[in-house]
UniProtKB/Swiss-Prot annotation:
Top-level lineage group: Bacteria
Protein name stated in the entry: Hydrogenase expression/formation protein HupK
Family: Belongs to the HupK family.
Matches recorded under SUPFAM superfamilies: HydB/Nqo4-like
One MF annotation (Gene Ontology) recorded for this entry: nickel cation binding
Stored Pfam families: NiFeSe_Hases (PF00374)
Disulfide cysteine pairs (residue numbers): none
Protein source organism: Bradyrhizobium diazoefficiens (strain JCM 10833 / BCRC 13528 / IAM 13628 / NBRC 14792 / USDA 110)
């Protein structure tokens, strides 16, 4: 069976003059995991997941392993839990940096080399089931810290003046003349059990268009920031979202370096839902990722569902749509660029197309 799927989100912005009257989102297609893997041994799936999920593949592997262990009634050893947390954090840092640069700005030679160094060092830390020697871990973390500094991010979350990142932040606000004052809601680990119960009960009907008591909460960097401090919906523009991402990169780098401070609650969480049933949540770069599995008596897959952050943030009634509807744009290309910047600041895990049309001219 082919593992290729339509990996793009189509976004249509309907304009009434300079005002966004509506936003339509055609979601990506998602791999039908139960249909692909029913009857296969759970242990055989781990090497396949990176082929299905090229971004945040470590987070997907950790979520799957944790869900399977929960279904089996097992608990990972403390050293394994710690290693999984480390590789999830390293991947999150790498993906946050990738989103700051890739498709946003052309990298000069120094910045490109620094990005490669981060990606290589993250890979050196190993996969979710591969512990690495402490000396290798220290070298990899030192390489990440040096590369992050080269990219212009300091430990105090400040941006180096004149850096590519500073220029990117400075240039991405100011063209969305006004934004609607939508009341935000944010996904947290406290919502996990409600979500995984729906995921197993309703399958793709839920994961394609999830909700939480009728609401579509935001997940990701901005939601994590909102969990730590009070923020205003009026401050949620592209530049503020980029600054939040940059601040989190610095925070993650510090944690990798020292590793002795509490980072967040529930970065990796698992739940036993009954005999042969388990689920897990992993807080990855773009938000909270869920896996849920049902196994038979021989640990073969009966049901396997997943819910990625993009399904919340790019929901037809979700945070992106609510951030755009009712906004007034500057005229011409600058206004369209402002919309593109806001869409990009939500950091979808797949590509997107953006089309502008006049309402009434469908």
């Amino acid at each position: 069976m082919s593992l290729s799927f339509r990996n793009e989100i189509d976004i249509t912005v309907w304009l009434s003059g300079a005002t966004i009257a509506d936003v339509a989102i055609q979601p990506r297609s998602r791999p039908p995991l139960t249909r692909l893997f029913a009857g296969k041994p759970a242990a055989s799936l781990l090497p396949v997941l990176p082929r299905l999920f090229s971004l945040c593949s470590v987070a997907h592997q950790v979520a799957f392993l944790s869900a399977v262990e929960a279904a089996q009634g097992q608990e990972a050893a403390p050293a394994t839990v710690r290693h999984r947390l480390t590789v999830v954090v390293a991947e999150r840092l790498t993906e946050l940096l990738r989103g700051l640069f890739v498709g946003r700005r052309a990298l000069d030679g120094t910045s490109a080399a620094a990005m490669r160094a981060v990606m290589q060092a993250s890979a050196l830390l190993g996969g979710p089931s591969e512990a690495v020697p402490q000396a290798l871990r220290r070298d990899a973390v030192a390489q990440i810290r040096t590369a992050v500094g080269t990219l212009g991010i300091s430990e105090d979350h400040a941006l180096a003046s004149g850096s590519a990142l500073a220029a990117s932040v400075e240039g991405c606000d100011g063209r969305l003349v006004s934004r609607p004052l939508a009341e935000p809601s944010f996904l947290t680990a406290a919502n996990d059990l409600d979500i995984v119960a729906r995921l197993l009960a309703d399958g793709a009907a839920y994961s394609d268009a999830p909700d939480l008591c009728g609401q579509i909460p935001e997940t990701g960097v901005w939601a994590r920031r909102a969990h730590r401090e009070e923020i205003s919906s009026t401050a949620a523009g592209p530049a503020a979202r980029l600054r939040a991402r940059i601040a989190e990169v610095a925070q993650l780098c510090t944690w990798l370096d020292h590793g002795d401070a509490d980072l967040e609650r529930g970065i990796v969480a698992s739940y036993r839902l009954g005999a042969g049933k388990g689920a897990a949540a992993v807080e990855c770069a773009r938000g909270r990722l869920y896996h849920a599995v049902v196994l038979d008596d021989e640990d073969r897959i009966v049901n396997f569902e997943f819910l990625a952050p993009t399904e919340w943030n790019f929901h037809a009634r979700g945070p992106l749509v609510q951030s755009l509807k009712g906004a007034t744009l500057a005229a011409g290309r600058p206004g369209q660029d402002a919309v593109r910047a806001l869409v990009g600041s939500f950091d979808p895990c797949v590509g997107f197309s953006l089309d502008f049309r006049e309402a009434g001219h469908a």
